[in-house]
């Protein structure tokens, strides 16, 4: 059975989970989001929690079939990076994500979304209710909203 990784990159914390194809949680890891000196430190923290979640799950990172990242913005989706995040120090101008994670996991199936939009997708397609219409709010280090209308 395939294994998957999910990453939550916020201004305060970075978290990762490893799960199997049934959605059974196999491992978790978390760390504080580095405050600098550059975005590479944040990238390394993401890779570290992914390694930690895989280790707790007892799986090799290279056995992961795909990964999803929900991250603070703004995002450069074409390059798979966070660009000049407002909630982090000015010295952090770019946080590369999909490229380094693709190398660690040995897969091109690494997907990046804004964290709030990822929440909307999760609630719409994977919650018990599967609501066609909703507003999803995040209130943390920043404030965000996602809307789903007519599915």
What would you call each of these model-derived segments?
Residues 72-75, 140-142:
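Short glycine-rich anion-binding loops that position phosphate/pyrophosphate groups of nucleotides
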Residues 2-3, 134:
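Short, basic/aromatic recognition patches
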Residues 3-48, 81-84:
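Short glycine-rich, Thr/Ser-proximal phosphate-binding strand/loop in the N-terminal lobe
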Residues 34, 43-47, 63-67, 74-135:
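Glycine-rich phosphate-binding loop and adjoining helix at the ATP-binding site
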């Amino acid at each position: 059975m395939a294994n998957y990784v999910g990453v939550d990159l916020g201004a305060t914390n970075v978290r990762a989970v490893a799960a199997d194809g049934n959605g059974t949680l196999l491992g978790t890891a978390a760390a504080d989001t580095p405050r600098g000196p550059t975005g590479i430190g944040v990238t390394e923290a993401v890779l570290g929690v992914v390694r930690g979640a895989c280790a707790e799950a007892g799986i090799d990172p290279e056995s992961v079939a795909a990964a999803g990242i929900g991250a603070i913005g703004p995002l450069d989706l074409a390059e798979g990076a966070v660009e000049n995040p407002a909630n982090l120090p000015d010295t952090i101008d770019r946080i590369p994500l999909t490229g380094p994670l693709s190398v660690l996991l040995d897969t091109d199936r690494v997907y990046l979304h804004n964290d709030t939009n990822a929440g909307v997708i999760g609630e719409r397609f994977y919650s018990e209710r599967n609501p066609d219409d909703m507003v999803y709010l995040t209130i943390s280090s920043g404030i965000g909203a996602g809307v789903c209308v007519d599915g």
